[in-house]
UniProtKB/Swiss-Prot annotation:
<protein>
    <recommendedName>
        <fullName>RNA-binding protein</fullName>
    </recommendedName>
</protein>
<keyword id="KW-0694">RNA-binding</keyword>
<dbReference type="Pfam" id="PF17464">
    <property type="entry name" value="Pns11_12"/>
</dbReference>
<dbReference type="InterPro" id="IPR035351">
    <property type="entry name" value="Pns11/12"/>
</dbReference>
<comment type="similarity">
    <text>Belongs to the phytoreovirus RNA-binding protein family.</text>
</comment>
<keyword id="KW-1035">Host cytoplasm</keyword>
<feature type="compositionally biased region" description="Basic residues">
    <location>
        <begin position="141"/>
        <end position="157"/>
    </location>
</feature>
<feature type="region of interest" description="Disordered">
    <location>
        <begin position="106"/>
        <end position="181"/>
    </location>
</feature>
<dbReference type="GO" id="GO:0030430">
    <property type="term" value="C:host cell cytoplasm"/>
</dbReference>
<dbReference type="GO" id="GO:0003723">
    <property type="term" value="F:RNA binding"/>
</dbReference>
<comment type="function">
    <text>Constituent of viral factories. Binds to ssRNA and dsRNA.</text>
</comment>
<feature type="compositionally biased region" description="Low complexity">
    <location>
        <begin position="160"/>
        <end position="172"/>
    </location>
</feature>
Length: 181
């Protein structure tokens, strides 16, 4: 069966409250109808995710794919269809090089790759701190004992300073009362 024989017709997707809410959140105009071509043979079913034209099996979204057999997120499908007209391939997004990505972030953010870069930078910095801790285990044990002594000394200083401020605040309150009388 060829692709032309497999083509049945345009399938209109139903719009529910979730789809309308998604379009409102994205500040997009809700199209009158979402039309998607339906193919009998799965071999010719192309994915309608926001990346460029490819087969369902080759989708970079992996488990978030929207195949023609199960439209779980009509809003994503509608990104390719504006008022029933297909956006040209040059207007669609290029496939992602990552295995998986957050589709919600993909829809709302300007540059979806930023969050993954930030996470990678954070993991590198935490790895550096772990490496520093591993280099001097004997120093850390000695410093803990010193830290206990210094913390108790700090507490004593804080307690004495707090009691002095309490006394001064009490005396200030007494002077205010006497001035009122």
């Amino acid at each position: 069966m060829t692709a032309s024989e497999s083509f049945v017709g345009m399938q209109v997707l139903a719009q529910d409250k979730e789809v309308k809410a998604t379009f409102i959140a994205l500040d997009r105009k809700l199209p009158a109808n979402l039309k998607v071509p339906y193919m009998k043979n799965a071999k010719y079913r192309t994915c309608i995710c926001p990346s460029s034209n490819h087969l369902v099996d080759d989708c970079v979204c992996e488990d978030v794919i929207i195949a023609y057999t199960a439209h779980r997120n009509n809003a994503v499908a509608a990104l390719l269809y504006s008022d029933g007209n297909v956006i040209h391939r040059s207007g669609t997004l290029k496939p992602k090089s990552q295995n998986r990505f957050d589709l919600r972030g993909f829809l709302t953010s300007v540059n979806p790759g930023e969050s993954s870069r930030n996470e990678a930078g954070a993991s590198k910095s935490t790895q550096k701190t772990y490496d520093r801790k591993d280099k001097s285990p004997s120093k850390s044990r000695n410093s803990k004992k010193g830290a206990k002594k210094s913390s108790s000394a700090r507490k004593k200083k804080e307690y004495s300073s707090n009691s002095e401020t309490d006394l001064s605040s009490d005396s200030d309150a007494n002077t205010r009362k006497s001035k009122r009388k």
